Amino acid sequence: MSIDIAKYPTLALAENPEELRMLPKESLPKLCDELRQFLLNSVSRSSGHFASGLGTVELTVALHYVYKTPFDKLVWDVGHQAYPHKILTGRRDRIDTIRQKNGLHPFPWRDESEYDTLCVGHSSTSISAGLGMAIAAQREGKGRRTVCVIGDGAITAGMAFEAMNHAGDIDPDILVILNDNEMSISENVGALNNHLAQLLSGKLYTTLREGGKKVFSNLPPIKELLKKTEEHIKGMVVPGTLFEELGFNYIGPIDGHDVLTLTQTLKNMRELKGPQLLHIMTKKGRGYAPAEKDPISWHAVPKFDPTTGALPKSSDNRPTFSKIFGDWLCEEAANDKKLMAITPAMREGSGMVRFSREYPDQYFDVAIAEQHAVTFAAGLAIGGYRPIVAIYSTFLQRAYDQVIHDIAIQNLPVLFAIDRGGIVGADGQTHQGAFDLSFLRCIPNMVIMAPSDENECRQMLHTGYHYQQGPVAVRYPRGTGTGAEPQPFEQLPIGKGVIRRQGNKVAILNFGTLLPDAITAAESLDATVVDMRFVKPLDKELILDMADNHDLLVTLEENAIMGGAGSGVNELLMQKGRLVQILNIGLPDQFVPQGSQEEIKADLGLDAAGIQNSINKRLFS
């Protein structure tokens, strides 16, 4: 059901930034109120990222009001906060399709709109890309401006500081807006600071500042006195020393929910030369009390009733794989004080809340710093501790060199608990866990396991933790398990699979949680089904036995076919000279868009019907 835009009379006048810029400045507070209410009503009907967008309503309105988008380039970091941006850039009537199959993309996406300058989803990329755009604009010479919006979490990543360090060195015209929603708006963010921000960003001050530098450049004592005076004025009210040292002119912090102050400050800053940083203070979940109170729970939400302020509880009582991991972590830590668990800012998503509370001295949240997380684990292992890195598949990509250089080459006993392996669903191309088996399988010394259910996941985590001959990865999916009952811990034999169903002619070698679909397909085909368990080392003896006693081998995995587990089987068969038909089923050579996990699996032929259909095509074509 579409939302009646007539209930939002000011928002109705601003379907795109050109129309927004025609509104009188005095109407902007009213526009913000309506935009926030529209966002609430839309996301409550469709699901999606919520709290971040509520916090950036005023900023989004001010940016599109002042800057000449899409001529000026606006770069959003991560993109969770960009729903208001989508609503104001011609996508208002489709916002209720966001994160759905064939709907709006969950993040800014270049193919979707000319207002989306960078495809995002992972954090801390905005300043690097924005710097490139700023240099291109500078050489173009048409007066195009570049603005990057980055949050206080994302700016902690090394890549953001690398970009700022570079920007400070080459001195482009670029504005970085630090959206700081970690603190409440304090007395530092009041009338004095708002006034000072407008003063320091104004043309009179900057003209005097630059003119004074030129006049007194040959009088070092006076030049130094002026510099210290300016630093003292800023230092009384702003924490900008770090950014100034990186070569940025720092303004703020100011109230990110005062749209009129934001608009005037941005208008001033658009005229400034060189690297600029505007620090704004916002509140995640602004304007909706439940989200303000608990922004983590309201970060991404299912459909909900906005009048009750209560998120619906899942009717599925089966534990998620993330919970399986978190509970196992607590069980293992109860018997081993040398266990150290590390997460790069994904405590809730990785199922580590309970562990962080019960074992705070053994828990490390290193922030958005995947590279550091992995090498930090290497240091712990060298020091005699037993580190576990809990990380999403898509984010492990960001620490690939550290896995090789700092872990595998030194053959250190580090356990990687890789969550969200395979199809993740609604977050689309940037978040599917499509590549981990491929990029880990080629690394020497690495042991890789893929459980078929939640009990096997527990056993593999236990096995990997107690395997001290080198690094181990246990890779499991997003979502709930099959309902398998947990069994007492046992260490699995390394590199050994298990036959789950004996059949004829066709053998399905399954890697991971597609096993139930494989068994369902096998019933109709009278096929053998093997739970391979290990991607590396492969159970060579079992694979060769299957090849010798079946006409067709089928490999099944929720990973890219290229370089994945199936490729490993192909390599073994070629190496051993076995001439047998083989069919690799997995993720195709394309980036998989958003949709529900069930929809995507069906589209890619990874459900029972699709598996059966692919096998029949091979058998009878």
Curated annotation (Swiss-Prot):
<dbReference type="GO" id="GO:0019288">
    <property type="term" value="P:isopentenyl diphosphate biosynthetic process, methylerythritol 4-phosphate pathway"/>
</dbReference>
<keyword id="KW-0460">Magnesium</keyword>
<dbReference type="InterPro" id="IPR005475">
    <property type="entry name" value="Transketolase-like_Pyr-bd"/>
</dbReference>
<feature type="binding site">
    <location>
        <position position="152"/>
    </location>
    <ligand>
        <name>Mg(2+)</name>
    </ligand>
</feature>
<keyword id="KW-0784">Thiamine biosynthesis</keyword>
<dbReference type="Pfam" id="PF02779">
    <property type="entry name" value="Transket_pyr"/>
</dbReference>
<feature type="binding site">
    <location>
        <position position="181"/>
    </location>
    <ligand>
        <name>Mg(2+)</name>
    </ligand>
</feature>
<comment type="pathway">
    <text>Metabolic intermediate biosynthesis; 1-deoxy-D-xylulose 5-phosphate biosynthesis; 1-deoxy-D-xylulose 5-phosphate from D-glyceraldehyde 3-phosphate and pyruvate: step 1/1.</text>
</comment>
<dbReference type="Pfam" id="PF02780">
    <property type="entry name" value="Transketolase_C"/>
</dbReference>
<dbReference type="GO" id="GO:0008661">
    <property type="term" value="F:1-deoxy-D-xylulose-5-phosphate synthase activity"/>
</dbReference>
<dbReference type="Pfam" id="PF13292">
    <property type="entry name" value="DXP_synthase_N"/>
</dbReference>
<comment type="similarity">
    <text>Belongs to the transketolase family. DXPS subfamily.</text>
</comment>
<dbReference type="InterPro" id="IPR005477">
    <property type="entry name" value="Dxylulose-5-P_synthase"/>
</dbReference>
<dbReference type="GO" id="GO:0005829">
    <property type="term" value="C:cytosol"/>
</dbReference>
<keyword id="KW-0414">Isoprene biosynthesis</keyword>
<feature type="binding site">
    <location>
        <position position="288"/>
    </location>
    <ligand>
        <name>thiamine diphosphate</name>
    </ligand>
</feature>
<dbReference type="GO" id="GO:0052865">
    <property type="term" value="P:1-deoxy-D-xylulose 5-phosphate biosynthetic process"/>
</dbReference>
<dbReference type="InterPro" id="IPR033248">
    <property type="entry name" value="Transketolase_C"/>
</dbReference>
<dbReference type="InterPro" id="IPR020826">
    <property type="entry name" value="Transketolase_BS"/>
</dbReference>
<dbReference type="InterPro" id="IPR049557">
    <property type="entry name" value="Transketolase_CS"/>
</dbReference>
<feature type="binding site">
    <location>
        <begin position="121"/>
        <end position="123"/>
    </location>
    <ligand>
        <name>thiamine diphosphate</name>
    </ligand>
</feature>
<keyword id="KW-0808">Transferase</keyword>
<comment type="subunit">
    <text>Homodimer.</text>
</comment>
<dbReference type="GO" id="GO:0030976">
    <property type="term" value="F:thiamine pyrophosphate binding"/>
</dbReference>
<feature type="binding site">
    <location>
        <position position="181"/>
    </location>
    <ligand>
        <name>thiamine diphosphate</name>
    </ligand>
</feature>
<feature type="binding site">
    <location>
        <position position="80"/>
    </location>
    <ligand>
        <name>thiamine diphosphate</name>
    </ligand>
</feature>
<comment type="function">
    <text>Catalyzes the acyloin condensation reaction between C atoms 2 and 3 of pyruvate and glyceraldehyde 3-phosphate to yield 1-deoxy-D-xylulose-5-phosphate (DXP).</text>
</comment>
<dbReference type="InterPro" id="IPR009014">
    <property type="entry name" value="Transketo_C/PFOR_II"/>
</dbReference>
<keyword id="KW-0479">Metal-binding</keyword>
<keyword id="KW-0786">Thiamine pyrophosphate</keyword>
<dbReference type="GO" id="GO:0016114">
    <property type="term" value="P:terpenoid biosynthetic process"/>
</dbReference>
<dbReference type="InterPro" id="IPR029061">
    <property type="entry name" value="THDP-binding"/>
</dbReference>
<feature type="binding site">
    <location>
        <begin position="153"/>
        <end position="154"/>
    </location>
    <ligand>
        <name>thiamine diphosphate</name>
    </ligand>
</feature>
<dbReference type="GO" id="GO:0009228">
    <property type="term" value="P:thiamine biosynthetic process"/>
</dbReference>
<protein>
    <recommendedName>
        <fullName>1-deoxy-D-xylulose-5-phosphate synthase</fullName>
        <ecNumber>2.2.1.7</ecNumber>
    </recommendedName>
</protein>
<dbReference type="GO" id="GO:0000287">
    <property type="term" value="F:magnesium ion binding"/>
</dbReference>
<feature type="binding site">
    <location>
        <position position="370"/>
    </location>
    <ligand>
        <name>thiamine diphosphate</name>
    </ligand>
</feature>
